[in-house]
Amino acid sequence: MQIIWSKNAQITFEAVVVYLEDNFGVNIAKKFIAKTNSSIQVIASFPNLYKAISLKQNVRKATISKICSFYYDVNEDTIVILYFWDNRQEPIDF
């Protein structure tokens, strides 16, 4: 399946990377990027691997680390990465 990054996903991903670089160093940020890319490749092959959120069955939440997840929308031919989320925040409702 084709992976598409939404504008929000690009912005929130970059914000997480900058936060990690500033607070934990470049190596931690690089590990986060690698883990994210790996998760996205797995999702491309197995789009329904992660749990669907309650109200929208086509939107799923993939956990990258205990502090960060990303939400993605599974469509017929594409997967849209919607945004990255700091798990320390209150969950969002769709």
Please name every model-derived segment.
Residues N48-T78:
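Basic/aromatic recognition patch in beta-strand/loop cores that engages polyanionic ligands
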Residues Q2-L55:
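Basic, Lys/Arg-enriched alpha-helical interface segments
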